[in-house]
């Protein structure tokens, strides 16, 4: 398959990126609430990248297992939304809301695991696209409130704006569309674009994430 070697390399690079950054965030002191959420989110993405690496072994790559893991891959969209919602509305996220947002993903996954009914996939992908669009709208409208929060709580706020949101939204769209496409039509180049876009997405979010060192005393 064309581009497969490059996709293998980018898979490993993405795993190292998510693993290293999540470790640094979760072991850093002092650590803010948003950094803890970001660290846990990136740790989950690291596990997803590790899962892809393990699937390179033919003995593990069965059709039912691959399809089942595709449903779990979709959970990454929910994980990303947790961070974005918390970033634009600090203190909003709690375990009850996490379960509420994740419950549709769990329902689709359980439905497939109980039936192995392949036609569930189009409905799942459709739900993910709708969910992503709604999250983008919510985060967009919350951006001004986020800006006010930054100005009130962080120093050097004149250098912080919500321009990152446009970049992150565009990269998220590329990442999501590529993931859906490669889930249906597996290609080496498609996987490569997905891994690169996922690293770019989180690099953008990491760069704009507030740091406790910036917080006013």
Regions found by a protein language model. Give the residues of each.
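Generic recognition of cysteine residues
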Residues: 80, 114, 175, 204-207
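Conserved small/polar residues in nucleotide/adenosyl-binding loops
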Residues: 207-214
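Cytosolic nucleotide-binding catalytic cores of signal-transduction proteins
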Residues: 217
């Amino acid at each position: 398959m064309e581009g497969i070697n490059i996709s293998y390399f980018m898979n490993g690079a993405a795993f190292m990126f998510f693993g290293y950054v999540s470790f640094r965030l979760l072991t850093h002191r002092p650590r803010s609430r948003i950094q803890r959420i970001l660290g846990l989110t990136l740790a989950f993405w690291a596990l997803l990248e590790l899962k892809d690496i393990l699937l390179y072994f033919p003995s593990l790559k069965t059709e039912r297992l691959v399809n089942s893991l595709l449903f779990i891959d979709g959970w990454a969209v929910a994980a990303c939304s947790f961070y974005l919602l918390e970033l634009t509305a600090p203190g909003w996220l709690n375990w009850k809301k996490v379960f509420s947002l994740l419950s549709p993903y769990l329902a689709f996954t359980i439905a497939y695991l109980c039936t192995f009914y392949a036609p569930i996939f189009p409905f799942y992908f459709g739900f993910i696209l709708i969910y992503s669009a709604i999250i983008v709208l919510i985060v967009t409208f919350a951006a001004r409130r986020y800006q006010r929060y930054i100005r009130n709580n962080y120093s050097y706020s004149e250098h912080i704006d919500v321009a990152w949101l446009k970049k992150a939204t565009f990269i998220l769209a590329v990442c999501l569309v590529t993931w859906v496409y490669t889930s249906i039509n597996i290609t080496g180049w498609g996987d490569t674009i997905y891994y690169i876009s996922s690293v770019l997405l989180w690099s953008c979010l990491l760069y704009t994430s507030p740091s406790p060192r910036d917080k006013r005393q």
